[in-house]
Amino acid sequence: EEVTEHVNYTGKRFPFFVSVTPEEDHIVFNGFNNYSFSTVFLDANLDFSGVYSGAAFDGGMSAILPLGADKFSLARFSFSDVYMNAGATLSPTAVDIAEGIPSEWKSELDAESPILIKNITINSTEYAAFLATTKSNQLTLMLYQAGSEELAGSKYLGDSVPLKACDFSITEDGGLMILTQATVMSSFNRIATIKLSKEELESLVQ
């Protein structure tokens, strides 16, 4: 029933994803395993390697970015709460629960909205960039140096029009283009973009 509601946009939206480790020795995907929303690791032969199981339909990973050497930047949810760890250590051969991964509670974030994590480079330094939606319908961009759990910089976006995070990418001129869903006049959902210049990005991590 939950999967049908996800497909038909009539219920909870689950953060399905597929990724691969930098060493290309494991595939990581979010899906259902033993009736729980789980993060599953497959080895290079596509055989089961390990799993971090969620709490049925109410907990699990929201997003994950493999950094290499068993390090991951991740966000996870538990009911209406969101937790983040930009430098978590996960074993691809573990059989464990997602809620047991040490993470920082982010009380302001909306667990029902997408969370995106990508590698970006600013001034030749790599960062794990988290883009999420707050419960007050703003966007928040958080930057961590690759593998570090210490916040390097952050920025809130949107204070008059409700926004929801959709995607983001570095532009050719070194800026950041953010794709978002904007709710106009409290009723109409529209696609919108927000551009941060190269200089604005650099100022976040100075």
Region locations from a protein language model:
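Repeated scaffold domains used in trafficking and secretory/extracellular systems
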Residues: H6-V20, A56-A69, L109-T121, P162-I170
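Hydrophobic strand positions within the blades of repeat-based beta-sheet folds
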Residues: V28-F29, T39, L74, A129-L131, ...
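Short glycine/acidic-enriched loop and turn motifs that connect beta-strands
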Residues: F32-F37, S78-Y83, T133-Q138, T183-S187
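A short loop-to-beta-strand structural motif that recurs across blades of beta-propeller domains
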Residues: S36-F41, M84-T89, Q138-M142, N189-K195
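Short loop/turn segments that connect beta-strands within beta-propeller blades
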Residues: L42-D47, S91-A94, Y144-E149, S197-E199
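Loop/turn-rich, solvent-exposed surfaces of beta-rich toroidal or solenoidal domains
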Residues: K106-S148
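Blade-level signature of beta-propeller repeat domains, shared across WD40, Kelch, NHL, RCC1
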Residues: A165-Q206
